[in-house]
Amino acid sequence: MITLQRTPLFDVYAKYGGKTIDFGGWELPVQFSSIKEEHEAVRTAAGLFDVSHMGEVEVKGVDSLAFLQRVVTNDVSTLKVGGAQYTAMCYENGGTVDDLLIYKRGEEDYLLVINASNIEKDYEWLASHVIGDATVVNVSSEVAQLAIQGPKAEGILQKVVSEDLKEIKFFKFKNNILVDGIPALVSRTGYTGEDGFEIYCKSEDAAKLWEKLLEVGAEEGLKACGLGARDTLRFEATLPLYGQELSKDITPIEAGIGFAVKTNKEADFFGKATLKEQKENGAPRKLVGIEVIERGIPRTHYPVFIGEEKIGEVTSGTQSPTLKKSIGLALIDVKYAAVDTEVEIEIRNKRVKAVVVPTPFYKRSK
């Protein structure tokens, strides 16, 4: 029997009606009320997520920048203290090790936030490529992460923070600020397509912070949210999920995150040659949006056809709570990736008609 890992918030899930599942070796809440209710709360008011299963790795030292430039695809030299950057790590063949966030806390002090299912793999990958005077330390067990997301997130969080949150712009953060007296790193980032904040604190402070935020946010409609809504929200916003839109067999260019790949930076990073070729001449496959015209919901790995030719497969799909449509993301042969191309998806041994549509499916009005 495999023992599932738990976050520091596990003991408070039941109080809020949390229903847990095995997610990549973690026992996490898939929902508290219903996925639809939680999804709509984030789109219209605010939702609070426990994302403490995510991994955190500290990179420090004189050679920390040179090291990061070698192992990630984005240009870390453009990052200023107090800034966050979305990036990827790739294998030499261009396949993706992981996608991640980098926070620059000091001139020689970076915090990397990596996917939960990849913590061990990523840490080993980073540690095995360390250069010079750079250190890599896995601090995942010491750090908890809460995400408060939605149009009312700022107002709710402001109740327990003395600093003016309006000063924290998108993809910026403040370190060591007090949230209801608890020291935390607060960043204006998220994985929902809405405005919001991610809060990093010590593991032992997480439960108190969770309870306080739900208490002060109750009148604005703040809801505890699980992984189910997190997935439908990120999917509508077309934010990739490692293991579905990204993998060791899928490059960042194919997955549509080429903006996080800077092949013109001086450093020779892993995968640079392949990614440069794909950026300049196009990748063989492309991640596209698809809308099912007939009955049926596209799910991960369902094959996509044109006639008798299999042109790719679905990476994620659902009945969109916001758009009320059956939509999916599919990685397909680039020849067929134009919007309005008619395709078929095999759903339970039956072909159903679908069409390529623009992405993102959902974009918030600013």
From Swiss-Prot:
It is an enzyme of class 2 (transferase). It comes from the Bacteria. Gene3D superfamilies: Aminomethyltransferase beta-barrel domains (3.30.70.1400), Aminomethyltransferase fragment (4.10.1250.10), Probable tRNA modification gtpase trme, domain 1 (3.30.1360.120). It catalyses: N(6)-[(R)-S(8)-aminomethyldihydrolipoyl]-L-lysyl-[protein] + (6S)-5,6,7,8-tetrahydrofolate = N(6)-[(R)-dihydrolipoyl]-L-lysyl-[protein] + (6R)-5,10-methylene-5,6,7,8-tetrahydrofolate + NH4(+). InterPro entries: GCS_T, GCS_T_bac, GCST_C, GCV_T_N, GcvT/YgfZ/DmdA, GcvT/YgfZ_C, TrmE/GcvT_dom1. Pfam families: GCV_T, GCV_T_C. Disulfide bonds: none annotated. GO terms for molecular function: aminomethyltransferase activity; transaminase activity. GO terms for cellular component: cytosol; glycine cleavage complex. GO terms for biological process: glycine decarboxylation via glycine cleavage system. Its EC number is 2.1.2.10. PANTHER family: AMINOMETHYLTRANSFERASE, AMINOMETHYLTRANSFERASE, MITOCHONDRIAL. Belongs to the GcvT family. The glycine cleavage system catalyzes the degradation of glycine. The glycine cleavage system is composed of four proteins: P, T, L and H. This is Aminomethyltransferase. It comes from Bacillus cereus (strain G9842).
